[in-house]
């Protein structure tokens, strides 16, 4: 069985948020999945060692507009996917999947404008798999650095792809100070 998951959000954080749901679909159908993602998600770098991922397809600008619709449809059609899971409510991706000859298309309800990213993905995936899904992401990284296991190691991602996702630098400083005060923590 060949499965495609479409996750068209821009950021690295967005991709990581969706990982538990991507993994759950892979496990449910006992097969690796292909992902259609934006280049800016860095999926090719982050997921190169992920045992649940077969192939990463990049959703770039040449797949925009009418010409892009047909180009993307042909790219999907060539791969002969059996199922497509669309993590958004876009009519465009629904039509692309159907135009590509995919028989089973699963997607959020069409035309939904307001959306809680984690809640919607969790409900969608739980409906598909019939199981409760943990929201804890798991990146399969090839080389693990030697870290002291008695210390919490925290990385702060202080940039974001969209203005609505950005937090003032002073907030990060206060967060780091509070964490340092209450937990044995090392910032990496």
Regions found by a protein language model. Give the residues of each.
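Catalytic machinery of carbohydrate-active enzymes
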Residues: 1-188
